[in-house]
Amino acid sequence: MFEMRSANPIENFVVSKIHIRGLDFAASVENEITHMEIYESLNGLVSGMFMFKDSIGVVDTIRMTGFEAIDVEFASYVGEQANRVYQKSFRATGISRMPARTGGFETVLVRFTNNLLTLNDYVKRPYVFKKTSISNIIKAILDNLGDEKPEYEIETSLYQRDFVTKIGKPYDIIKSIVDHASTDVNNSCKFMFYEDRDSVKFASLGSIRDKEYEYIIRKGADTGDGKWTSGNTNTITALRVVVKEQSNMHEISSGLFGSRTYSHSLIRKKLTTKDVRRNDYIAQVGILNDRAHMYTNELEFASEVPETEQPLNSIQLLPNDGFYEHDNKHPLGSIHGVSLMEETYLKAKQIIVEIPGNTNITVGDVVFLDYHAVTGENHSSLDASGRWIVHELKHRVEPNSFITTLELSSDSSVNIAIAGSKK
């Protein structure tokens, strides 16, 4: 175990365990590491790597093959302030051995990921289900992995009649069916299958958007007016903020202003057309903040073309055989059209934020960014400030530093009249 103590308490952290477990031997290398990274994303499962000086001959003793179990345990805030410990077991996916140029100890790089991706390569089969839901299908696939199934939290989705999968691997099958799920709780149709700090998750973007934020991340001076920081929350000062993307023509063409879905059924020899309009989407599905990205109304930008006659930005043709019971029962039309708009809105705005290492924040959380522009009056940025979803996260640990990098995504901006509201 090693720990870092600083005059600034928020820079304290502890690495309790980095174990490599082979078939016959195990070794602790946390005191030897020179670098470790853990990656989380709403798009998949956790992966990472670490490097260490092999001063005790771990590689040859364990006879590492790149398939060992990796146990990791670390936390920000040493002592009683370690609110959430990052504790997981992974499976190594490969190693690299790099000899020292000066004749010293060699450096070993170990890459690892969630064991589900390893188990995925051992099974290939079709799945057949009757009168069930996507959430139940995912549970069944994960439970079939036996004792090595991952810990999971599955949000309930709507039922459909029957479903037959293609012949494929378990993880690949799960990734191929998540876009067919929908929920009647918040009209959300975009589900994500991902892994955060605690477990594997199957959750709708609607449930993620509705989360309360626990942390305020501030960049720039505090105005002291409390406008942006109402509520009992923790405040973090960002080390660096980079506005990655605010407006992208690709998002417009992908369905930011609306979508049309043609659903065809070879069984019933039928073609169904469903449109999703932007105002209906905002009203019934919802957004993170007060004002949808690139939104204009008739008072600001009058249009002579009625909304029902305006062209739609995205058109897709999809089969719905196997999902014919529920595909077009969403209040706004086909679930695929709503899902596409949710995904497009999620990518409308992106910001990268570096903060002192923090294991209390994980992917899928909502944070409030309080971004102050450097001007004479220290104005808060309405475009950069507001509620953001943690879309991707990277923990970077070295013997003397721990940095967490967040990639934040949002679909909207705050309105100065009601900024900071928790919805």
From Swiss-Prot:
Domain of life: Viruses
UniProtKB keywords: Late protein, Viral baseplate protein, Viral tail protein, Virion
GO cellular component: virus tail, baseplate
Induction: Expressed in the late phase of the viral replicative cycle.
Compartment(s): Virion
Membrane-spanning intervals of the chain: none
Key word Isomerase present: no
Subunit-structure text: Homotrimer. Interacts with gp5 trimer.
Described function: Baseplate protein that is part of the baseplate hub. Involved in the tail assembly.
The protein's name in its UniProt record: Probable baseplate hub protein gp334
Species annotation: Vibrio phage KVP40 (isolate Vibrio parahaemolyticus/Japan/Matsuzaki/1991) (KVP40)
